[in-house]
C-alpha cells in the first residue's frame, strides 16, 4: 500500500528468497506460496533470489538483489526501515565504504564481536535495527556498482526482528521460536 502511494503507475517487482533463507534455514513457506501471497498483495512480478545470495548475510543478500534489479534497469528500490531516515542511512553507507571503516570493522571482528556488533562499534556505536542494516546493505550495493537505482525507505511500523507480538503481528524470530517450541512438545 505504501509503495502504491509512492509509485502508483509503476510495475512492482519483488526479489525474494526461495526455499532457503538467511543462515541457510529452510523457509517456513515454500517459494510458490510466497509468490502467490506477494501477487495477491499487489506485486506484479516475483523474482527468486538464488540461494547463493538469499542464504547468506545481509550484505550478500543485498548485493544479489541490487545486481538483479540493476540488470533489469529498475529505477527504484523500496525497503522497510526502523529508522525511516534515508539521509542518515546514506551517510552511514558512504562512511562504511571507506578504508578507515573497513580497518576498524576488522579490528572489532578480530576481537571476537559478531558482525552486527562490530559494525555498530566501527560506526561509533550507532545502533541500527535489522531492517536498517539490510537497508544500509542495499545502499552500499548501489554505491559499489555505481547503480542509478534510487532508494526509498518505508517505516517499519510493526514488530522488530526480535520482538514478540504487537498489534497482531509477530517478528520472524518470534514465529520461528514458537514453531521450534511446538516441535519440542
Model-derived features with residue positions:
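N-terminal catalytic cores of NTP/NDP-binding nucleotidyl/phosphoryl-transfer enzymes
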Residues: 1-34
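N-terminal cationic-hydrophobic initiation segments that often serve targeting/anchoring roles
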Residues: 4-7, 39, 69-70, 143
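Glycine/small-residue-rich interface belts in oligomeric ring/scaffold proteins
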Residues: 22-46, 52-61
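Active-site cores that bind ATP or allylic diphosphates and position pyrophosphate for catalysis
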Residues: 49-185
Amino acid at each position: 500500500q505504501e509503495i502504491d502511494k509512492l509509485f502508483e503507475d509503476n510495475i512492482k517487482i519483488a526479489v525474494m528468497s526461495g526455499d532457503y533463507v538467511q543462515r541457510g534455514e529452510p523457509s517456513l513457506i515454500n517459494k510458490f506460496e510466497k509468490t502467490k501471497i506477494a501477487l495477491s498483495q499487489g506485486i506484479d512480478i516475483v523474482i527468486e533470489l538464488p540461494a547463493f545470495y538469499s542464504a547468506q548475510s545481509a550484505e550478500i543478500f543485498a548485493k544479489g538483489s541490487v545486481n538483479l534489479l540493476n540488470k533489469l534497469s529498475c529505477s527504484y528500490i523500496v525497503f522497510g526501515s526502523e529508522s525511516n531516515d534515508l539521509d542518515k542511512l546514506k551517510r552511514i553507507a558512504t562512511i562504511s565504504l571507506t578504508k578507515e571503516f573497513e580497518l576498524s570493522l576488522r579490528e572489532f571482528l578480530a576481537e571476537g564481536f559478531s558482525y552486527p556488533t562490530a559494525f555498530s562499534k566501527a560506526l561509533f556505536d550507532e545502533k541500527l535495527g535489522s531492517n536498517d542494516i539490510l537497508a544500509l546493505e542495499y545502499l552500499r550495493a548501489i554505491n559499489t556498482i555505481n547503480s542509478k537505482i534510487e532508494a526509498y525507505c518505508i517505516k517499519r511500523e510493526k514488530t522488530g526482528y526480535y520482538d514478540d507480538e504487537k498489534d497482531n503481528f509477530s517478528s520472524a524470530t518470534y514465529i520461528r521460536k514458537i514453531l521450534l517450541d511446538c516441535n519440542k512438545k
